[in-house]
Amino acid sequence: MRTFPLGLAVAAIVCFPTLISHAAGPPPAALKTFLEREGFGGSPLQRRFGNHLFATTIINGRRMALAIDTGAPFTLVDSASARGIGLRVQQTKAHITGVTGLTERADAASIATLRMGNCTFLNVPVGVADTAEINAVRGPHLDGLFGAHEMSKFGVVIDCARQMLYVNPHGASPAANQNLAQFLTGRGFSRIPMRFDASHHLEIEAKVNGHPVAMIVDTGAATTFLPAPVAYNSGAATSGVNFMMGGATGGALPAKIARVQELALGNLLVHDAELTIGESKVGGGAGLLGEEYLSWNFGIVDVGGMNLYLRPPESAPRKNR
C-alpha cells in the first residue's frame, strides 16, 4: 500500500485483441476466452520470489518489468530506471508513504509508450520515486509499479491465480462489467464490492472474528496484513513468529504472524486464517488483503467494475507458511 497524491491522467490505449468468432455457440468456459469475446486485450503475468505478480513491458522501446500493484494508487517508475530510459522528470512537492511509514519524494514524468502484452498505453503520466527496496529479494528486477489509477481508467481485470491481466481498450464499460459479474457468479464466485478510499486505495468491507474492518485489495502485498490494534481487538492470537516486514518504498516494520478464527470476505469465509500483524503507519486502521489469499481463492480483481470476485478452492489444506 502506498499513498501518492499526484493528479494524473492517461491519454489513450491501443489493443490488438485475439481475433475470435462471435458466431452463436455455447458460452465460453474459460475467463480468457470470455474476456476476448468482450473485446479485452491480455497480458500474461509472472510471479517472482516474494509473491509479487509482475508484467514484462516495453517502455519507450526498452524492456522493463512492473509489479502489478492494486495497492498503489498510481503508476510509479523507479528513479534509477527513469534515468536509464531518459525520462524527463519534473520535480514536485508530492510524497509517497508506504505501510512502514517511510516517506519518499515523488516527482512526475510521462511515458510516451508502455506496451503490455497486446496493448499499448500512450502518453502515460507516472510518478518517479526510489523503489529500490522492492528488489531487496532475489528474482527478476522490477522497475516500478503499475497502479490503480490506470487500472481503473481502462477497465483492467486481474486474474491472480492464473496470472493474467486484461485491458478494455474502450475503457471501463458497465455492460462488460455486468457480463463479467454474470459469468463469474454463475461459476461459484462471490462478488465483493470495492470502493476507493480518500487516498485512492481499493477497499472492501471484511470481518475478523465478526468485527468489521476495511481491507485494501493489494496485489502488491505478499501476505494479508492487519494493524496490530485491529487484530488484537478482534481476538487474533500470535504464533510467536516475529520478523521485519519491508515496503516497496523502503523502511522496515516489526511484524508478527497471527491467526484468527474467521476472516469473512463477503460471503467467503476463511477459517483459522493466518495473517501478518504490525504497527501500520498509514491507512487509518485498514488492513491489506494480500496476494496469498487472493491467489489461493482464485481472486479476480475487476478494477473497472469495482468488484472483487473470490471462490474458495474445492478442497485445500490449511495455508502453511
Residue ranges and their predicted role:
Residues 1, 13, 22-23:
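Generic N-terminal simple sequence motifs
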Residues 1-7:
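Positively charged n-region of N-terminal signal peptides that target proteins for export
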Residues 7-18:
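Bacterial N-terminal signal peptides
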Residues 21-321:
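Pepsin/retropepsin-fold aspartyl endopeptidases
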